[in-house]
Design a protein with these regions (language model features):
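N-terminal polybasic/positive-inside topogenic patches
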Residues: 6-17
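N-terminal Rossmann-fold NAD(P) dinucleotide-binding loop
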Residues: 35-36
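Rossmann-like NAD(P)(H) cofactor-binding subdomain of soluble oxidoreductases
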Residues: 109-175
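Rossmann-like NAD(P)-binding element
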Residues: 74-136
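C-terminal substrate-binding/catalytic lobe of Rossmann-fold NAD(P)-dependent dehydrogenases
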Residues: 155-161, 170-330
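Glycine-rich Rossmann-fold phosphate-binding loop(s) that bind the pyrophosphate
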Residues: 31-32
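Conserved N-terminal Rossmann-fold NAD(P) cofactor-binding segment
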Residues: 54-94, 322-330
């Protein structure tokens, strides 16, 4: 029988990232459910030597960070987790995940959060600009596409260093619902959701397959249509159940997958909200598109061929993003 505290080599645990694969510091802004869960996942994956959680609520980031750090001997990670109410501890972060903002309540759309969260993200972005001017930003706060715009506008960062977490989450929901309908592993579902992070998102049926088999050969169109609609309202479905908050397990997983692709220079093709400069015939907005992520952040935007219906739906989604963008006050 092994004693408590036996070395990992005896316990058969998986190896974590080496020092050379880590970045020095990743900051999570916001210590609510999404932020705290993101910080825990980042630490468990050892993507940074230090994970900083910053929040205006006194004691909350400190208490949650201490709790997470005390899980390190059990989970087997050495990433240090610290909590703070100021930005000095976040200085020179390589990646910053912005989750700060109020959460949705039943009956609220993501756009209902616009003015309140725009003010919060503006203030956060001003702090980031002065303390971590070389950071890569991953925006999670809603309404996602517009908050990504606010962060880029206020910091002045190039588009390569400002990304929105949207399509990774929406695609995960889409894949989960398909796997459930077919009773197969989620690992075998290949799919992609583009467009704005809202009711006009565009699940690409033409690029959806199960181990290479087109989804249209496996499910009737009515079932596919129902899954597409459930994907679009996936966040609202969770809000309705929770009543006092919104999703955080899947959103945090999505944000961390993006961080991992960047830290480990994986060259992953992930659907993210990116600033368009002519791609897909659009410019001047953040929209979910296939992005190649590496150590420099956004390395390229992949333009895929779309059906006429998908092109029209993407244009409609872009219009839905532009409207609140024009209403936001900076």
């Amino acid at each position: 029988m092994l004693a408590v505290g036996a070395p990992d080599s005896f316990r058969g645990t998986t190896l974590h990232n080496s020092e050379s694969e880590m970045v020095n510091k990743i900051t999570v802004v916001g210590a609510g459910n999404v932020g705290a869960t993101t910080a825990q996942r980042l630490a468990e994956k050892e993507l940074a030597r230090t994970v900083v959680m910053v929040d205006v609520m006194e004691g909350i980031p400190q208490g949650k960070a201490l709790d997470q750090w005390q899980s390190a001997p059990i989970e087997g990670f050495d990433s240090r987790v610290i909590g703070t109410n100021g930005y000095e501890e976040t200085r020179d972060s390589e990646i910053i995940v912005i989750t700060a903002g109020i959460a949705r309540k039943p009956g609220m759309s993501r756009d209902d959060l616009l003015n309140t969260n725009a003010g919060i993200v503006k203030q956060v972005s001003q702090q980031i600009k002065s303390t971590s001017p070389n950071a890569i930003l991953i925006v999670v706060s809603n309404p996602l596409d517009v908050m990504s715009y606010v962060a880029m506008k206020v910091t002045g960062f190039p588009r390569e260093r400002v990304l929105g977490m949207a399509g990774v989450l929406d695609t995960a929901r889409y894949r989960a619902f398909i796997a459930e309908a077919l009773d197969v592993s989620v690992r075998d579902i290949q799919a992609m959701v583009l467009g704005g992070h809202g009711d006009t998102m565009v699940p690409l049926i033409s690029y959806t397959s199960v181990s290479g088999i087109p989804i249209t050969q496996l499910l009737p169109q009515a079932t596919i249509d129902a899954i597409v609609e459930r994907t679009r309202t996936g966040g609202a479905e969770i809000v309705k159940h929770l009543k006092t908050g919104s999703a955080y397990y899947a959103p945090s997983s999505a944000a961390v997958q993006m961080c991992e692709a960047i830290v480990l220079d994986q060259k992953r093709i992930l659907p993210c909200a990116a600033w368009l400069e002519g791609e897909y015939g659009m410019s001047g907005l953040f929209l979910g598109v296939p992005c190649k992520l590496g150590r420099r952040g956004l390395e390229s935007i992949i333009e895929v061929a779309l059906t006429r219906g998908e092109r029209d739906a993407l244009a409609k989604s872009a219009d839905a993003v532009r409207e609140p963008m024009g209403a936001v006050k900076l």
